[in-house]
């Protein structure tokens, strides 16, 4: 698992390979990831937008942004957690993702919360160090 803490908001990511949706013979590799967002602050916050920076093993970058996550803009009161799952397809057997959420505190202040970088590695992937 991967974790980041920004402004007392903790983001935990657990990626997993989706073998049943992947087809290596057709250069299709799919991962799921589970995210848990925990509000350790003393104010309510709402997740407004998301931004993802996705890089495959060839260095090809894809940037994804939009409102909320999975169609929601969840409100997290102090002590609350919010969990969701989503996925990411790549044309290569490995890659890396990171990003941020834009949050709005109950007083109207907006700030970004880091999504930690996490690796997407196919099972059985052999790495060579030169």
From Swiss-Prot:
Record domain ApaG: where: 3-127
Database matches in InterPro entries: ApaG-like (IPR050718), ApaG_domain (IPR007474), ApaG_sf (IPR036767), Uncharacterised_ApaG (IPR023065)
A Pfam cross-reference name: DUF525
PANTHER family: OS05G0170800 PROTEIN
Name by which UniProt lists this protein: Protein ApaG
Organism annotation: Sinorhizobium medicae (strain WSM419)
